[in-house]
Amino acid sequence: PVSNLKMATDTLLEKPMTEAERTDFIRGIRTQTDKLDFLFQALVKTSRLETGVIQLDKKVCNLYDTVAQAMSGIVYAAEKKEISVSVNCPEKLMLSHDSKWTAEALFNLLDNAVKYTSAGGKISVSVVQWEMYVEIKVADNGKGISESNQAAIFRRFYREEEVHSEPGVGIGLYLAREIITRQGGYIKVVSAPGNGSAFSIMLPVK
């Protein structure tokens, strides 16, 4: 983002252009500053978790509210791409978890699903209680991920070559896994190129 910002501002300063061209460059600068802000916020959150500045606070609360909080962050982006989003979650499922940070982790999975699902695609969110865990699954019919890359996607700053055109910095899945792992849970993925992806947050019942 920084190099793109420098290039855009240099062009604005040095090259004569029409008002329409100038407006396009300013929009581009805004996009890059948004990316920079996203990266900064993600790095701050990750650093605070890793250094213990932020301690997760698990309390028994309604998981439906946590899911709703995460969903609210992707509604506009999904509508913009005409992606249909369905949710199947019990309204009275009480679970010991950190609602704020679990919503952050779920939002990161949802955000990825929106980014890598083509316009007009589908995303489904489902919540199921098993004997030992509660599963929050985010499934899409997007690009999919090869089996050889499925472990790597949780590394910090990792991004697959074919998705570099999409916005992102490669830290969302890493942060999501950190949040869930610190609550005694884990994240699993089932995916194949061309067949979409299903990410499941598994949180312990006790």
Where are these regions (language model features)?
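Short beta-strand/loop element within the Bergerat-fold HATPase_c
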Residues: 120-132
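Short conserved segment of the HATPase_c
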Residues: 145-157
